[in-house]
């Protein structure tokens, strides 16, 4: 996910985010582990067990870009109009007296090799992100991704049998070599005071530390949720409601409410 995150980092790192600091750090498990370890070393008050992290909570104690080794591209192309729009500026910025709307592309292309199955693996992702704020109390974020991928055999077996890719949603065959799938997530945050905020969205949440969680993991597909965060001094209380769905084509009508 190097390319995808590099573009995210450039977008979220612009001065615009300072006007409304309710955006999440992009939620990739491997990166969360590095950020979690770096935050723990600072011994600063930080609630690491509830993810995704807020940028407003991370940036006072660590620099996420430095921890993850993100280095902005500084070549000649980066100084051109196209390069600036890809690496350091927002592609589209609509500003108005009480806020702004920012639109940016997101790309990812990775390749690998499954030696046991003698198979070349790859993922091709194209997407768009939209974020903005209305005054100091309202922030919003949304993204959409279209993907094609050649998967390792154990994931191909799941996709062929159930019609889904774990954590990625429904899939359909892509030519004869892979699978096609798409997903979206987003959220709206209302922060009436410094010590409380209300967030409604569709996405993933994680409760716990480390790679896996028995309480709430990020393995499930995106789901609608309502979250209320209340914080006073070193105490933080989170209320979380969500609705999980079994999205297998044959069981799409069966919901599990929590």
Q: Could you say what each language-model-derived stretch is?
A:
Residues 22-258:
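Outer-membrane beta-barrel channel domains
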Residues 1-24:
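Bacterial Sec-dependent N-terminal signal peptides
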């Amino acid at each position: 996910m190097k390319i995808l995150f590099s573009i995210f980092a450039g977008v979220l790192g612009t001065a615009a985010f300072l006007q409304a600091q309710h955006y999440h750090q992009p939620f990739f498990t491997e990166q969360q582990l590095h950020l979690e370890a770096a935050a723990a070393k600072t011994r600063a008050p930080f609630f690491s067990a509830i993810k995704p992290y807020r940028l407003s909570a991370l940036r006072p104690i660590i620099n996420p870009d430095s921890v993850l080794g993100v280095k902005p591209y500084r070549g000649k192309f980066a100084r051109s109009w196209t390069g600036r729009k890809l690496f350091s500026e927002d592609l589209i910025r609509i500003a108005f007296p009480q806020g702004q709307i920012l639109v940016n592309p997101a790309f990812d292309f990775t390749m690998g090799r499954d030696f046991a199955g003698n198979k070349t693996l790859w993922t091709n992702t194209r997407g768009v992100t939209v974020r903005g704020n209305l005054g100091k109390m309202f922030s919003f974020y949304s993204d959409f991704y279209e993907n094609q991928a050649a998967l390792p055999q154990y994931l191909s077996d799941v996709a062929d049998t159930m019609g889904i890719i774990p954590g990625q949603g429904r899939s359909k065959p892509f030519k004869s070599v892979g699978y096609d799938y798409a997903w979206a997530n987003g959220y709206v945050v209302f922060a009436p005071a410094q010590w409380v905020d209300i967030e409604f969205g569709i996405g993933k949440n994680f409760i716990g530390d480390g790679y896996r969680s028995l309480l709430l993991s990020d393995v499930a597909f995106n789901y609608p949720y309502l979250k209320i965060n209340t914080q006073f001094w070193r105490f933080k209380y989170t209320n979380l409601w969500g609705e999980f769905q079994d999205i297998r084509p044959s069981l799409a009508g069966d919901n599990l409410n929590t």
